[in-house]
Amino acid sequence: MNRPEIQIVAISNVFTRLMHFVNRGDYEAGHTHTYDHATMISAGSVLYEVLDGPDGNAVKAKEFKAPGYVFVEKDKYHRITALEDNTVCVCIHALRTIDETIISPDSFIDPMYSTNNGEIKNAVRQLTGISWNEITRYEQVGGHHG
């Protein structure tokens, strides 16, 4: 079991993170956010689990099939596991400052950045003066559920 292949695109202040789960059983490790967002299931199917915290024990689980969306609640640890080969999911949310203010599209010099290797993190830091971790508050925890 592996982690998904990732592609990131930010247009104005809309951030998308495409996850391509090549094989059934590939997973996105448990993590949490300080904001609500949506994950679009565009191909295949996933097991979405809400975890009890950093140790990664599932307290709720539900299967989702494409096409569809998963509402990802803020401050809830969660994990996504592919149930089919070539499953594709896209996390969608607004870029925010540390105080949860959505970053204005007017603050960007160029309206679009696309990356596979972290260029978006540097671009956001340069344009806003805020670190990527402060904006996304993406905290990864735990491992896979064995």
Which residue ranges define each predicted feature?
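A short glycine-rich, His/Asp/Glu-containing loop-to-beta-strand
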Residues: 1-30, 35
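Short, surface-exposed charged micro-motifs
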Residues: 7, 38, 47, 69, ...
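Double-stranded beta-helix
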Residues: 12-20, 79-146
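Residue "hotspots" at secondary-structure boundaries inside conserved domains
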Residues: 20, 30, 39, 62-63, ...
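Short beta-strand His + acidic residue motifs that chelate non-heme Fe in jelly-roll/DSBH
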Residues: 28-30, 48-49, 72, 77-84, ...
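Short, conserved beta-strand element in jelly-roll/cupin
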Residues: 32-48
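Residue-level signal for short segments within beta-strands and strand-turn junctions
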Residues: 42, 50-52, 93
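Short acidic-glycine-tyrosine-enriched beta hairpin
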Residues: 53-74
